[in-house]
Amino acid sequence: MREIISIHIGQAGIQVGNACWELYCLEHGIEPDGTMPSDTSVGVAHDAFNTFFSETGSGKHVPRAIFVDLEPTVIDEVRTGSYRQLFHPEQLISGKEDAANNFARGHYTVGKEIVDLCLDRVRKLADNCTGLQGFLVFNAVGGGTGSGLGSLLLERLSVDYGKKSKLGFTIYPSPQVSTAVVEPYNSVLSTHSLLEHTDVAVLLDNEAIYDICRRSLDIERPTYTNLNRLISQIISSLTTSLRFDGAINVDVTEFQTNLVPYPRIHFMLSSYAPVISAEKAYHEQLSVPEITNAVFEPSSMMAKCDPRHGKYMACCLMYRGDVVPKDVNAAVATIKTKRTVQFVDWCPTGFKCGINYQPPSVVPGGDLAKVQRAVCMISNNTAVAEVFSRIDHKFDLMYAKRAFVHWYVGEGMEEGEFSEAREDLAALEKDYEEVGAEGADDEGDEGDDY
């Protein structure tokens, strides 16, 4: 089996996790208590969904996941929520004091105490797998737990499971909306280790998703639940090929191979279509070409950055539902002729497509309409650098005055770590610039390998 372990860290990671597991359960017909009426082969672990769920002897399906937070309130909601019987109590790990929006607390002081317990639980999950394929890590980098403990866990996973791939779903601070003053510090410090310790990181930002909810779903004041349900659709689409037997399957390691041209250039944009409310769905024809065009629209991107300002290096299209390869090929051919979708000149093909015949499910009473077919795109575009330069700029404004730095130093960090992380990000911006530059002939020494 090719199992995947999901790790949800901090408030954002846990709440996105709730939305994801709710959706997975719906898709597989698993009840909130973990039973699966349709599963005839009880105890046989050969079904495709066993990549995400482990099956107990009594026929209960338990998510291969852990939820970690440094303070209990958010995890207590899981412990008392409608899916409380789905998880083993040991999978929900909470501390007593939170990271107070401070990377250093999450990474050094408070996080240190809980990280061994987390790794212990991960080890138990891993021992339960026959062929662990990798980890999905969910966190936000603006707060303290997601950024600090998130980085710490990623670093430790690299040590313990060096060869396994790690996919991050990372919520980045939005340009306008902010939940903490020190977001730029936490993000820069955390990205420093995301660079090293994740193989693919999908960037999400709340503001972009708010806008999609407002515009496409007519929700005037979107809540986190609305946002997370949209995010969970993306994550579900990415993982359908692992959880169902499909037509053209896309494996986690395949993502890496097809999306990451150079190890550091692994920050992805994602988009999903059709995002449409039930009232509108009746009146629109959502054909394969239409939804394919929609995912390339700048307004569909789940992070605030404009793909037209950059060039695509690669993109992965995951279709699900009533889709045949012929339609996909036609739609992709049309996209290639568009001038707005520009590829770097050293990567002319750039499309990886997957199709899964399982139609998209929606949460009953949710905002999204039930549709016949949907597509999710994960793309590697040089415009992602906009996200970093925005955060770097805010970081510089504060760091020039050393504002708030004493809180970090007081928790055992050294000032040098700030400048080290900041330099790493400056180098990353530069990397993106070079990758998107016209022609690769200015790097003469690299062309001689052929």
From Swiss-Prot:
Protein source organism: Zea mays (Maize)
GO-annotated biological processes: microtubule cytoskeleton organization; mitotic cell cycle
Subunit and partners: Dimer of alpha and beta chains. A typical microtubule is a hollow water-filled tube with an outer diameter of 25 nm and an inner diameter of 15 nM. Alpha-beta heterodimers associate head-to-tail to form protofilaments running lengthwise along the microtubule wall with the beta-tubulin subunit facing the microtubule plus end conferring a structural polarity. Microtubules usually have 13 protofilaments but different protofilament numbers can be found in some organisms and specialized cells.
Primary site of residence: cytoplasm
Phylogenetic classification of the source organism: Eukaryota, Viridiplantae, Streptophyta, Embryophyta, Tracheophyta
Name of the featured protein: Tubulin alpha-6 chain
Reactions accelerated catalytically: GTP + H2O = GDP + phosphate + H(+)
Positions with a binding annotation for GTP: Q11, E71, G144, T145, T179, N206, N228
Stretch forming the signal peptide: none
Cofactor requirement: Mg(2+)
Subcellular location: Cytoplasm, Cytoskeleton
